[in-house]
Amino acid sequence: MRIAIIGAGPAGLSAAYDLSRAGHRVTVFEGAPSVGGLASGFKAPHWEWTLEKFYHHWFASDAAILGLIKELGWSNEVLFPRPVTAMYHDGKFYAFDSALAVLRFPGIPFVDRVRCGVVALYLRLTPRWEPLERVTADAWLRKWLGPRAYECMWKPMLVGKFGEENLQVVNMAWFWARIHARTPRLGTFKGGFQVFMDKLAKVITARGAEIRLGTPVKGIEKRADGTLRVATAADAAGFDALISTCSPVLMADITPDLPAAYTAQLRTLKSLGAVVMVLALDRQLTNGIYWHNLPKDAGFPFLAMVEHTNYISPAHYGGDHIVYCGDYLNPSHEYFRLAKEELLERFLPALERFNPHFDRRWVRQSWLWRSAYAQPVPSVNHSRNIPAIRTPVRGLYFASMSQVYPWDRGTNFAVEMGRKAAKMVTADFATRDPP
């Protein structure tokens, strides 16, 4: 069977892996010059490892991607260090990645810290998220944490992540999933995520699949014979089935044959973009903290400062100390228009708040990465709004991170989504009468 896949990120490659292993003729179309999607990386000439453009890590609970890695025989190439995550309060950073750390956090009274611990324990132990999607995270957390703890700790994080305009939108099931799945140890692949993606792509092409890089799909049409025509700028070809892993808006734009109701579902899904500045410094910026959570109202020009080399040794990056300055923003935000030099002028002065001795001469090199589609916004009762993977067009499937729910988007659930779509294709066409 001829199967097309749009997108060579974790979802698309996972689907291609399963379908090529089943003997199908698979063609993957990818608009970017490399595989990996949002998990793709880059490499300076003097580095031993690649580095993710947008910071990534795995949790020890990420069964889908760790299971795939085990299938491939690469488990010995996965590392799980335990870095330090910190919360900003009153000009200082405090560890905030364990029950003991929360009890020591000075930003709220001790009784509220205990209350936070009880709520976190409840969220970790309760198995059902469905009742939680009926209420906003703002309302639920304010009620059960109490106003002091919520205003100090979690409201600034929610506003930073989704924006003030979405504070009354994001549902509590999303927050439950963040707590439920989180582990203190964070995983990565030796050599970086790009090495993993490249190795997976080689396995897929060794089975006869084709991966066409730098080839964005311009249109999908259903034909009278039941096949699907996939058009690129260079050519067009017919396929028996197609799995698209692109953004909902792009899916709607390139597939005019979708019914109006399904297209409306696609266009209703809200999401934010990501802007990430990566800096290579000649020395360590902070004293061992990996992830710095920054409340928006504290005046930082970005949401998170991640000192990657407090997690992975700078020896893998030629001695460079790697710092990410990142934010989730509406694609209309000025950060998507400003030049790298203009953003550096906004970002670099803020680094003095992490280290008063910081000097911009410490910066050896910088890179700017932007994506207009990076973070879905899950609204109240979001499960009712998610488009089905199996679209109303026969043989056409849609598997994107906007359908990952209630879990937060990431490579683990992208793998799960891609393999689920591949299984649907196999099952549907086994009957020779796909829906």
Task: Give, region by region, the residue ranges found by the protein language model.
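Conserved Rossmann-like nucleotide-cofactor binding loop
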Residues: 11, 34, 249
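Glycine-rich FAD pyrophosphate-binding loop
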Residues: 20-45
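Active-site/ligand-binding neighborhood in enzyme catalytic cores
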Residues: 108, 117-220
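Conserved flavin/dinucleotide-binding core of flavoenzymes
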Residues: 305-435
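N-terminal Rossmann-like FAD-binding beta1-loop-alpha1 element of flavoenzymes
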Residues: 2-28
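Dinucleotide-binding Rossmann-like beta1-alpha1 core, especially the glycine-rich loop
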Residues: 46-131, 143
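Mid-domain catalytic core of redox enzymes
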Residues: 22, 218-323, 328-337, 341, ...
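Short loop/edge segments at beta-strand edges and connector loops
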Residues: 7, 80-82, 213-215, 221, ...
